[in-house]
């Protein structure tokens, strides 16, 4: 392997000459052999956007030459596009400020820009990783800015569309099933009737509320720390840098990023991402409920509830021929469990900042992005391979409806709660129908039962 010598404030170190990173990245590789977690493409892209925007603004403010700006922008564009992803090798489990990954981006952009200019990698000429690429920045404000860029893009580009896709499919099912009457269940026990469409409308509403929750948290994610530098004072930045840089990032992404009004909060705390993670946890809880309902309703096919059928996607057992399992519900419930667990880590990280800097930044963004990705992919998979293929089993639905003792509730206004309860208990004890039980007890006639117990009149408000 051909190497070159890179330098930093600690001296010289050999680096694989085929790589664009420099001394600080190399030292991090030596010191943090921890797990397999690497920063995802979303964070690398965000750092590229940030470095490009900073160069544009620094040039606009007269702090960076036009030639240097062009070189940095060209190299940063390659980072943004993903062309240089292999040159970002660092573990998530590193310094809590993300300093090594910030320097990784500075070094890669510097060396690639030097190469574009026809220079020698590692020379730091004509583009210096600190003086030029990192101008008017500190890891303490760049890394949280990249965190917010990455999270905001993924919430907008992946999670919201995935939730909408699933919601729309459930809305179609709600309309399709609006006239199919079934027995309700509370406490896992029989309850009064509703329609299958009404049941599915609950899922639609959950998803609509969750989409609204994501949109409600976005304004706090749009607030950027850039311009705070080391502790929030803005040391070594132009007075206009923070606002202009946020505006440039907004232009690059098409999202309404703004400069955080208080940089001390933006560096020392990550309450906005803790809040975001809480929203993701809420979505996970909703999806857990929906996925569980679907697999219970489809259980069987002969010895379970079996009121709906779901697509048969793959064999379900290596020993039981013909078995098909609710695998999409299972992936979704596992994803939900993981997202809830991720939120615990984010909460601990968010609560553990000290004085002017939170040093759990990589942990926080790793888990937030992981939760967004898991929820997004899970919703798309569930919609494509399960939700859109759900069909009602009308025979089973009618069987359960007609067998339910809870239809007796319709008799309450006519014969009173106590007498209705007697009919239900007697029918259950003797294995008869409600109608037979009521007639036997002399509490109603056949005609009265037929007039009063009408499931189709029990699915909306009524005092008749």
From Swiss-Prot:
Pathway: Carbohydrate metabolism; tricarboxylic acid cycle; (S)-malate from fumarate: step 1/1
GO cellular component: cytoplasm
Site (Important for catalytic activity): 330
Presence of keyword rRNA processing: no
A molecular function (GO) term: fumarate hydratase activity
GO biological process: fumarate metabolic process; malate metabolic process; tricarboxylic acid cycle
Xref: Gene3D superfamilies: Fumarase/aspartase (C-terminal domain), Fumarase/aspartase (Central domain), Fumarase/aspartase (N-terminal domain)
Catalytic activity field: (S)-malate = fumarate + H2O
Cysteine disulfide partners in this protein: none
PROSITE patterns reported for this sequence: FUMARATE_LYASES
InterPro entries: Fum_hydII (IPR005677), Fumarase/histidase_N (IPR024083), Fumarase_C_C (IPR018951), Fumarate_lyase_CS (IPR020557), Fumarate_lyase_fam (IPR000362), Fumarate_lyase_N (IPR022761), L-Aspartase-like (IPR008948)
Quaternary structure annotation from Swiss-Prot or TrEMBL: Homotetramer.
Leftover remarks: There are 2 substrate-binding sites: the catalytic A site, and the non-catalytic B site that may play a role in the transfer of substrate or product between the active site and the solvent. Alternatively, the B site may bind allosteric effectors.
Stored NCBIfam families: fumC_II (TIGR00979), PRK12273.1 (NF008909)
Name of the protein described by the UniProt record: Fumarate hydratase class II
Organism for this UniProt entry: Leptospira interrogans serogroup Icterohaemorrhagiae serovar Lai (strain 56601)
């Amino acid at each position: 392997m051909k190497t070159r010598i890179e330098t930093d404030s600690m001296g010289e170190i050999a680096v694989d000459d085929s790589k664009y990173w420099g001394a600080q990245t190399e030292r991090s590789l030596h010191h943090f052999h921890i797990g397999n977690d690497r920063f995802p493409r979303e964070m690398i892209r965000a750092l590229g956007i940030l470095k490009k925007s900073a160069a544009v603004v620094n040039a606009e403010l007269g702090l960076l030459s036009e030639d240097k700006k062009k070189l940095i922008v060209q190299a940063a564009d390659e980072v943004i596009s993903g062309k240089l992803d292999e040159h970002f090798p660092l573990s998530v489990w590193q310094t809590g400020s993300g300093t090594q990954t910030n320097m990784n981006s500075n070094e890669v952009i510097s060396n690639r820009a030097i190469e574009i200019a026809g220079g020698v990698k590692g020379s730091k000429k004509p583009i210096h990783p600190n003086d030029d690429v990192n101008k008017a920045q500190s890891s303490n404000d760049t890394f949280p800015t990249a965190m917010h860029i990455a999270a905001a893009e993924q919430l907008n580009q992946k999670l919201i569309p995935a939730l909408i896709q699933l919601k729309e499919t459930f809305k179609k099912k709600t309309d399709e099933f609006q006239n199919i009457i079934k027995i309700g269940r509370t406490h896992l026990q029989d309850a009064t009737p509703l329609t299958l469409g009404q049941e599915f409308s609950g899922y639609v509403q959950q998803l609509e509320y969750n989409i609204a929750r994501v949109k409600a948290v976005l304004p706090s994610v749009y607030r950027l720390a850039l311009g705070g530098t080391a502790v929030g004072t803005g040391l070594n930045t132009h007075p206009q840098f923070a606002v202009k840089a946020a505006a440039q990032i907004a232009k690059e992404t098409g999202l309404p990023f703004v400069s955080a009004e208080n940089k001390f909060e933006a560096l020392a705390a990550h309450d906005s991402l803790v809040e975001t993670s809480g929203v993701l946890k809420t979505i996970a809880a909703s999806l857990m409920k929906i996925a569980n309902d679907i697999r219970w309703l489809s259980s069987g096919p002969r010895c379970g509830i079996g009121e709906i059928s779901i697509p048969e996607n793959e064999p379900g057992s290596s020993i039981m021929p013909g078995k098909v399992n609710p695998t999409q519900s299972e992936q979704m419930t596992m994803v939900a469990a993981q997202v809830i667990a991720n939120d615990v880590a984010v909460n601990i990280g968010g609560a553990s900042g000290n004085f002017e800097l939170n040093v759990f930044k990589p942990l926080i963004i790793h888990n937030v992005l992981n939760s967004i990705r898991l929820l997004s992919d899970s919703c798309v998979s569930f919609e494509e391979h399960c939700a859109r293929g759900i069909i009602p089993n009308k025979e089973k639905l009618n069987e359960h409806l007609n067998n339910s003792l809870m239809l007796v509730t319709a008799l309450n206004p006519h014969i009173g709660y106590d007498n209705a309860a007697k009919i239900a208990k007697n029918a259950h004890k003797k294995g008869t129908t409600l109608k037979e039980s009521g007639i036997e007890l002399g509490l109603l006639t056949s005609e009265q039962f037929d007039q009063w117990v009408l499931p189709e009149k029990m699915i909306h408000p009524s005092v008749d």
